[in-house]
């Protein structure tokens, strides 16, 4: 079997294809947030609204350009008090622009290496100077986009911002995990045509083992692949099914993308039957599952926003709009991390968090998607949100009662 894995990331078919082609070459990144403040080019999908929320000065959110934040109840996770122990989210992607204004204060930091000596493996984990993660493509600590990725918009930068974009920093956007998530950047795929740019099982296994060893509690996979190996299966089983090998280790959850490119089966890692797999099913702001969405195995499957999503870019404007199942995965990852970092759930291990928060509360929400047209989801799926766990409301659009969705900002 070919040892390379086809790493696939799709666009949502409900919107013009041109809106998916935002990855244009650029030389610099604007931090003004000007692009994020403008009306969205897909505003026909998302009615414009000004958010009266004093908890953030991010213009993208306040101007109504981040419909998905309140859609998942993300603003309920924001607090005036610092989170004592943010949840580490391992992002498996093409890297991330660590200097971006939305990310530079929202990255996981390996303190031993950050405060150690350059060129020395200060923490003895086998990786030198791995301050914010590791580049498994070029096997070095620089996790920013490399090679042919430089100057492009960067898929990983966009995903990282949907997980944990910094709130209230006077820039463009905020994320559900702004307070409670920190992103560990694991560069596992490149942008060019070189053999080493392709995702392969050995690299994924190394990255999974690294993330588990370094304390990641949410593993975010916005891509999918159709083939696997016994070794890769075993690595995912260690992370998402087996008890933690280390006493006191809370364990980890894998958030997997359910693609919307017309394939019959969801592919890996969504296809794994492991008990700590949570799947993101792409939906629009109308509660409709994206056409072409693959069938997901039974389990913890949640509808998560995919269309007309504003996020950070490594390109000139600093921000861009994207549509697709990747967005659903990153948004769900940030939401889960933000919940897990908040009281009283921060003390839970992975299995207890899944049982008491995700399965017993989130999956019992009264908000569900509509059934899909192909019949793969005849009862729809529960919509991902924090409202069943909410103790307060931040704006009129958050946590509406059943039957009020038509008045909700979308």
What residues fall within each predicted segment?
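Catalytic-core regions built around general acid/base machinery
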Residues: 228-254, 268
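Extracellular S/T/G-rich loop segment that most often corresponds to the catalytic His/Ser-adjacent loop
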Residues: 93, 267-341
């Amino acid at each position: 079997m070919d040892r390379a894995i086809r790493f696939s990331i799709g666009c949502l078919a409900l919107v013009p294809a041109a809106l998916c082609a935002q990855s244009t070459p650029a030389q610099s990144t604007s931090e003004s947030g000007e692009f994020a403040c403008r009306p969205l080019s897909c505003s026909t999908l998302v009615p414009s609204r000004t958010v009266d929320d004093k908890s953030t000065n991010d213009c993208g959110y306040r101007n109504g350009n981040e419909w998905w934040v309140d859609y998942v109840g993300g603003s309920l996770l924001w607090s005036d008090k610092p989170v004592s122990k943010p949840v580490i989210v391992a992002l498996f992607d093409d890297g991330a622009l660590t200097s971006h204004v939305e990310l530079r204060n929202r990255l996981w930091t390996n303190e031993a290496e950050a405060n150690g000596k350059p060129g020395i493996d200060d923490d003895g984990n086998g990786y030198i100077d791995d301050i914010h993660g590791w580049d498994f493509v070029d096997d070095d600590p620089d996790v920013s986009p490399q090679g042919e990725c430089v100057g492009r918009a960067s898929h990983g930068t966009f995903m990282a911002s949907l997980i944990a974009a910094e709130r209230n920093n006077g820039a463009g956007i905020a994320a559900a995990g702004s307070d409670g998530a920190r992103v560990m950047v694991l560069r596992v795929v490149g942008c060019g045509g070189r053999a080493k740019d392709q995702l392969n099982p050995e690299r994924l296994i190394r990255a999974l083992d690294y993330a588990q060893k370094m304390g990641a509690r949410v593993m975010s996979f916005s891509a999918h692949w159709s083939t696997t190996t016994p070794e890769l299966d075993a690595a995912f089983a260690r992370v998402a099914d087996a008890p933690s090998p280390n006493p006191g280790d809370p364990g980890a959850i894998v958030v997997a993308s359910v693609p919307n490119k017309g394939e019959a089966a969801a592919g890996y890692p969504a296809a794994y039957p492991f008990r700590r797999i949570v799947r993101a099913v792409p939906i629009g702001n109308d509660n409709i599952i994206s056409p072409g969405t693959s069938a997901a195995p039974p389990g913890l499957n949640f509808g998560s926003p995919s269309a007309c999503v504003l996020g950070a870019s490594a390109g000139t404007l600093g921000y861009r709009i994207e549509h697709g199942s990747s967005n659903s995965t990153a948004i769900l990852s940030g939401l889960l991390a933000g919940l897990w970092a908040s009281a009283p759930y921060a003390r839970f291990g992975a299995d207890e968090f899944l049982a008491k928060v995700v399965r017993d509360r989130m999956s019992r929400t009264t908000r569900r998607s509509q059934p899909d047209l192909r019949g793969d989801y005849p009862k729809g799926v529960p919509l991902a949100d924090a409202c069943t766990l909410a103790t307060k409301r931040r704006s009129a659009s958050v946590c509406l009662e059943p039957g009020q969705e038509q008045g909700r900002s979308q």
